[in-house]
Each structure stands twice: as C-alpha cells, then as structure tokens.
C-alpha cells in the first residue's frame, strides 16, 4: 500500500471528467429535442426517451453496480468509462433513431457504475482529510457535464446540425475515458484490501438509521432538482418567459451549484457544520420553490434559482461524504443506494409535477411541500464529529455480515 499523500488528485480529476461525460451524453438531446425529432424523423416524445431511460435503468442497475465496485473496483470503473465512451461513438453509427437509442442505452448502463463510485474513488485515492474535497470535485464534474450539455446543444446542434454535436461529444467522451484508464493503472491506497461486502450488504446498510436518513435526503433533493430541470420551461411559459430565458435560468442554477460544490463541502466537513447546512438547504429548496411560483418578475426568479443552485447542489457531495464515512469498505454499494434513492425521487417528483404542469403555482407549491419532508431528516444528519460511533457500528455490522457468509460457505 503506498503512502497517503496528494498524488491521487490526477485520478480524481480524470474520474470527474468521466462523470461529466456521462451527464453530457445523458442530456445530449434535451436542449435540441425539436431539431433531434426532425433529424431522426420521430416525435418529440420519442426523443424524450433518449434521456428518460437513464433513471429507469439506474433504479434497476444501481445495487449490482455498487456490489461490482466493492468487489472489483478498478476493472469495473474502467469498464464503466469505456462503455460511456463507446456509447458516444455508437450514436455515430447512422442517422436513425435506433443508433441513437443504442448509444444512449450503453451510456445508461455505464452511468450507475461511474457515478456510484464517487465515494469509493475518493476513499481509495485520497487521505481522509481530503476526501470531502475529492467527492466535491467529482460532483462538480457531474454538474459541469450537465452545464456543457445545455451549452453545446444549442451552440453546435442548432439548425439540425445534430451530427456535428454528436461528433464533438463522442471525442470528449473518448478523451475522458482515456484519461481515467491512464490514471487507474496505479492502484489506490486501499487497492490491496478486499472489501468485506457480500449479498447482505444492502440489508445491513439499510438497517442503519443514518443510511435511511441519507437516502431520504437524496430522494427529496434529487426529486426537486430533477423536477425543476424537467419542467421549469413549461411552468414559466404561462408567465410569458421564453424557452431561451428559462434555459438561461437553468444554466444559472447549475453554474451557481458548481461554484458551491467547489467551496462549501470541504469547509463544512472541517467545521462539522453539515447538519446546519442541510437544514438550510432543505429550507432554501422549500422557500425557493414557493418563491418561483409567487414571483412574477424574471429578475426575481433568476435570483431565487441562483441561490437555490448555490445551496442545493452542494448538498449532494455533503451527502456522499457522509455516506463514505458510514459505509467503510462498502462505499460502492452505499453510494449506489444513495443514487438509486435520488433517481427514484426524480421519477416520483417529476411525475407529481407533470400532473400539475398546467397549474404552475400548484406545481411549485408541490415541490415546496416535498422539500419540507426533508426537515426532520436534516435534523438527524450526521456531522463528521457525531457520526464516529455509528461508523464503528456500521463497519462491525458489515464485517459480521461478510463473516457470516464466509462461515456458511465452510
């Protein structure tokens, strides 16, 4: 095992670029759905499935992906990066919807392996006091990928130039996967340690109250963010806000979130202020959604959504850092559980808003109500200082689960 220094940052940077690539390829067609429909000769609703298959497959594949990361970490992550890049290239196979869907399916299968590894990559390649920063960088990479998709779509894919957009994104995906492959040649700090994880790890983790708290917060936070990203343009249209202006609001939210991810999570971890921050994030989400429904001026709404992005998006790396502390050798499975809960939240809250989409104020208030469900959860959020006891209990439970399985095999 090599010494714990800062030499793992190239791996973190390469991994963040692959996280960005998965999000970029996921949202390729969302900003240019009408042009994509004309390009492939299908309906706009059919184009929507090119993005909607991602959360659906994530819910199915999350736990197997997490177990794979815990037992075969580097090979699994390499395969995830390679499959992401292959999906981007596969979309260039022909000007048919089938080729587009084939590429998206490949990326959708890779996504659970890639993003579920955020905690484990930081745990394997960074010392303890740098892990919160590492998870924040990877999370910022994911949000940067979303931002890049929102920018490149209208810039390169306008006026039916879909192939040009796909070529550029395929190149970016291949470069990111190549960088990850190069940096993963060197094993991490814990590369020679076998994870004490077996089939019962999910049940063991779920038995921990803190794990259920973290999953609940992911469900709420992801749910509201995905619903906003999906329906904001439609909800603001009755107020006379154009599709382009609504797109700018989303970009502002993500930009503010990336800035928050760069600064807040490591600072909060050092000060043990995660619980206070999560309370603020939940309340910001609730009051922000209500304000978006109540305000009529575009400038006021822009200010609200920027503040929401600045506070809400950094909550993801804060949750993932707490999950990594809790899970011990089962970081992959635990991370997959968090992301699965988040994707479930995205599906559920987006469907709730879809029912209310023709009543914008009711839709925004529904998202505010969902946000308030996180208030009691945030009150139980584990800080770095308060979680030590349960981390020890969780590690012992996981080790005991693995020992029990081994005993049954003898």
Feature map (PLM): residue ranges:
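Juxtamembrane intracellular "pre-TM" segments in multi-pass secondary transporters
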Residues: 2-5, 185-214, 397
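Extracytoplasmic gate region of multi-pass secondary transporters
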Residues: 29-30, 210-251, 257-258
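Conserved MFS/SLC helix-loop-helix module at the cytosolic interface between two early adjacent transmembrane helices
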Residues: 60-95
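Helix-to-loop junctions at the C-terminal end of transmembrane segments
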Residues: 61-73, 260-273
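Cytoplasmic helix-loop-helix junction between adjacent transmembrane helices
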Residues: 103-141
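Helix-loop-helix hairpin linking two adjacent transmembrane segments in secondary transporters
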Residues: 137-185
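C-terminal transmembrane helical hairpin of 12-TM major facilitator-type secondary transporters
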Residues: 274-319
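A late C-terminal transmembrane helix in Major Facilitator Superfamily
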Residues: 326-360, 367
């Amino acid at each position: 095992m090599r010494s714990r220094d800062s030499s793992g940052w190239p791996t973190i940077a390469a991994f963040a670029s692959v996280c960005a690539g998965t999000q970029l390829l996921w949202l390729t067609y969302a900003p240019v759905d009408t042009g994509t429909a004309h390009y492939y000769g299908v309906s706009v609703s059919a184009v929507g499935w090119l993005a909607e298959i991602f959360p659906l497959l994530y819910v199915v594949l999350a736990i197997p992906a997490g177990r794979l990361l815990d037992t075969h970490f580097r090979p699994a992550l390499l395969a995830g990066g390679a499959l992401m890049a292959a999906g981007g290239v596969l979309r260039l196979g022909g000007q048919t919807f089938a080729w587009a869907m084939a590429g998206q399916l490949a990326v959708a299968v890779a996504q659970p392996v890639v993003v579920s590894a955020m905690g484990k990559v930081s745990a394997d390649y960074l010392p303890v006091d740098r892990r919160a920063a590492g998870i924040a960088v990877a999370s910022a990479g994911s949000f940067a990928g979303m931002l890049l998709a929102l920018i490149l779509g209208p810039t390169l894919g306008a006026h039916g130039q879909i192939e040009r957009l796909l070529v550029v994104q395929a190149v970016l995906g291949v470069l990111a996967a190549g960088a990850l492959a190069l940096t993963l040649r060197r094993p991490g700090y814990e590369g020679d340690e076998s994870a004490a994880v077996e089939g019962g790890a999910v049940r063991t983790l779920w038995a921990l109250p803190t794990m259920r708290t973290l999953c609940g917060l992911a469900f709420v936070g992801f749910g509201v963010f995905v619903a906003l990203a999906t329906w904001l343009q439609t909800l603001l249209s009755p107020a006379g806000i154009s599709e382009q202006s609504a797109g700018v609001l989303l970009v502002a939210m993500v930009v503010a979130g990336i800035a928050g991810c760069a600064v807040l999570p490591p600072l909060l971890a050092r000060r043990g202020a995660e619980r206070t921050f999560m309370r603020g994030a939940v309340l910001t989400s609730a009051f922000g959604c209500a304000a978006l429904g109540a305000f009529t001026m575009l400038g006021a709404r822009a200010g609200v959504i920027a503040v929401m992005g600045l506070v809400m998006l950094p909550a993801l790396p804060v949750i993932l850092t707490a999950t990594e502390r809790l899970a011990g050798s089962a970081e992959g499975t635990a991370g997959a559980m968090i992301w699965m809960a988040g994707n479930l939240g995205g599906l559920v809250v987006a469907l709730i808003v879809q029912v209310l989409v023709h009543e914008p104020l009711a839709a925004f208030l529904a998202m505010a109500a969902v946000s308030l469900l996180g208030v009691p959860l945030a009150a139980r959020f584990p800080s770095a200082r308060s979680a030590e006891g349960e981390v020890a209990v969780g590690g012992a439970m996981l080790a005991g689960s693995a020992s029990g399985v081994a005993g049954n095999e003898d």
